[in-house]
Structures are given as C-alpha cells and as structure tokens.
Amino acid sequence: MRFLMILLCSLLWTAQGYASIGNVILHEGNGEIERTTGESQITVKDLDVFSYDVVKTGNGKTVIEFVDETRVDVTQHSKLIIDEFVYDPNTKTGALSLKASLGTVRYASGQIAKNSKQNVKISTPTATIAVRGTDFALSLIHI
C-alpha cells in the first residue's frame, strides 16, 4: 500500500511538473522539437509544447499557440528556444522568455504581453527585445 501511495504521488508530481504550455497548431515540411530529456520529436499538428523546448525547422514551418494565446511562427531553417513560460489564467498574467537563435520568427502577443508587458522578452544572440503588446517578425542571418 505504501508503495502504491509513493507511486501515485510521484505520478502527480510529474504531471504537474511538465504541464503543456501550448501546442503546434500548424506544421508544414520537416521539423523537430528537442525536449529537456534529450529526446527529439518530429513536429506534427497538435503536438504539446513545454517550457525549455527547442523548436527547430528544416525545410518547413511550425506555428505554436501558447495557452495565453501568444502565437509564434517559426519559419524554415530556424531555431527557437522557449526559455520561460509562466501563466496564471485567472489573472491573465505571467512571464514569457523566448530566444531566437537562427532564421526567422514571427511573434504575436497574447494575454501575458497585454497584462504583464514587462515580463515578456525575446532575445537573439546579440540583442533583447522588450515586447509591449505587438506583432513582429525578426530574422537572424549568420555572416
């Protein structure tokens, strides 16, 4: 009985520790999502996305919608790292930090940017963008 209780508690902790923060709403071509466990999953529509995932596209495009309605389009030959995502659906506040390290990414603000503007950051290898509730695209070119 004791073993069963420990197992049940560990399963509940794991489920809460790895809650989905959004999902892939559109995917074309090839791409993958690297998990913190080191495993990679082929990107498909409706695939769950988690904090600390790394989204990579080859000859394709991946569109992610987070639970706060933030939308990020990762175009071909791009890489996006989800550094932080915290969201309280009751207050519609939280924090979002993304790192675009290659290619082109389009960002459209959701509830976090509308209600916690100071807590949204998009960074690149050479700059950080403080988002103030907007829609923009950025391209990174390696020379």
Model-derived segments and their meaning:
Residues 5-13:
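Bacterial N-terminal signal peptides
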Residues 18-59, 63-141:
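Flexible, surface-exposed loop/linker segments and immediately adjacent secondary-structure boundaries
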